């Protein structure tokens, strides 16, 4: 056995769902257990157990070893890990309002109030859906390099979706927020009237017009921009995708992949939803520069990919729970700000489209193609925002879009907390950007 890792995981969570003024769900749960990962005969083995008794851990260890030997007999690619820096640490992220200390009835009361604010905004509001989730996770990683780290992290998230209707026209407004914090997140969102904003958006979109169709210069807000960086580009820079031949930038290290004004980072040290101090291989988290001034300079790594690509791991391997092995994941991904004001960015556009709020997206990572449906937009004419637009979608080629970024703003914001799915594992992430401008984007949508 050349490598062994034991990872304890525990998550205590609660969730609430309110629909149209009725509390539909009030749940809570605990999951816990240990995952064992080994390299035996130069092959990976993994097994997990929900029971943490010595006998069950021994059984899981035997299963992991047996699995590695079975794989070795099949001639699967050899496993290898880079020798990591030894770490011994205990980290506890403190919440101002520990979710466990807030009475469930109080949580429901606040959610009902948020839902009511949205529901009573207008008689054109026809459906409201407000959800809440908190979770406190404990991860302990101990491996044969001598690393022993523990990290306790609270996360809280709230979401409000409002559907408006006028005749046959139906529109949706969405607001959400969260991060590494406690119930204070919900109090802040309540103060910011986030559910009212969702309702206001949905109702105003009823009087918006369909978008123009064609190829345009577009200006995108922080949410559209951040999620573009995460979905369209970030997954291409996860080293397992590179090694698996599924990345459009696999052979472009050191080459220009974007405009000179583009710098893209993934930074787990930022206190946002993707924040952590140690990844689930026990590696200390560091900021990762992926693209610097338009040039591809780095990938996100695990211990294995770092060994295979002769790189240094900076803390990018995480697992959903003890039941899964760590895989390479993004954390807080963003486009770094420059110095242009929003008004100046618009001023250079004779005719284009301003896009705000991501609704949904589809990315073909291997082909480098993206399609995004945004919440709303505005027509830009001679540097001024004009007609309000609904049902807007955009599509294009990722690398072409990055190279056609002609302006990057200074108004940086990271405010897209969510859960990113990959290989059956949902992991907390965040994304951000300043406003930025792209030429040559195909705009369309429902007419």
Question: What do these predicted ranges mean?
Answer:
Residues 1-447:
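N-terminal small-residue-enriched
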């Amino acid at each position: 056995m050349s490598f062994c890792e034991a990872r304890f995981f525990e998550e205590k969570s609660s969730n609430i769902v309110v629909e149209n003024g009725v509390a539909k769900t009030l749940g809570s749960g605990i999951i816990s257990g240990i995952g064992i990962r080994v390299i035996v005969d130069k092959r990976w083995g993994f097994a997990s157990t929900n029971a943490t008794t010595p006998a069950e851990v021994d059984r899981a260890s035997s299963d992991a070893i047996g699995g590695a030997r079975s794989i070795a007999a099949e001639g699967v690619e050899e496993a290898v890990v880079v020798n990591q820096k030894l770490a011994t640490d205990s980290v506890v992220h403190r919440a101002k309002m520990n979710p466990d200390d807030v009475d469930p009835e109080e949580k429901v009361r606040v959610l009902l109030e948020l839902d009511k604010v949205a529901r009573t905004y207008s008689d054109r509001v026809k459906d409201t859906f407000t959800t809440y989730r908190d979770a406190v996770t404990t991860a302990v990683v101990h491996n044969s390099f001598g690393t022993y780290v523990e990290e306790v992290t609270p996360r809280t998230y709230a979401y409000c979706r409002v559907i408006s209707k006028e005749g046959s026209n139906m529109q949706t407004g969405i607001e959400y927020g969260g991060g590494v914090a406690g119930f204070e997140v919900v109090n802040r969102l309540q103060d910011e009237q986030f559910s009212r904003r969702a309702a206001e958006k949905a109702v105003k979109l009823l009087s918006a017009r369909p978008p123009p169709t064609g190829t345009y210069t577009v200006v995108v807000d922080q949410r559209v921009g951040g999620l573009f960086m995460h979905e369209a580009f970030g997954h291409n820079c996860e080293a397992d995708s590179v090694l698996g031949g599924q990345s459009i930038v696999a052979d472009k290290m050191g080459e220009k992949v974007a405009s000179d004004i583009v710098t893209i980072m993934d930074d787990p040290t930022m206190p946002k939803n993707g924040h952590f101090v140690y990844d689930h291989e026990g590696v200390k988290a560091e900021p990762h520069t992926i693209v610097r001034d338009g040039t591809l300079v780095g990938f996100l790594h695990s211990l294995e990919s770092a060994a295979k690509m002769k790189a240094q791991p900076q803390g990018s391997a995480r697992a959903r729970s003890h039941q899964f092995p760590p895989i390479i994941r993004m954390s807080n991904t963003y486009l770094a700000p420059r110095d242009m004001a929003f008004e100046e960015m618009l001023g250079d556009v004779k005719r284009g489209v301003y896009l705000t709020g991501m609704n949904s997206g589809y990315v073909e990572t291997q082909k480098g193609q993206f399609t995004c449906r945004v919440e709303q937009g505005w027509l830009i004419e001679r540097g001024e925002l004009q007609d309000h637009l609904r049902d807007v979608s955009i599509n294009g080629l990722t690398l072409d879009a990055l190279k056609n970024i002609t302006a990057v703003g200074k108004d940086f914001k990271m405010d897209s907390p969510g859960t990113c799915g990959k290989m059956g594992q949902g992991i907390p992430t965040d994304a951000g950007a300043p406003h930025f401008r792209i030429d040559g984007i195909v705009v369309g949508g429902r007419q």
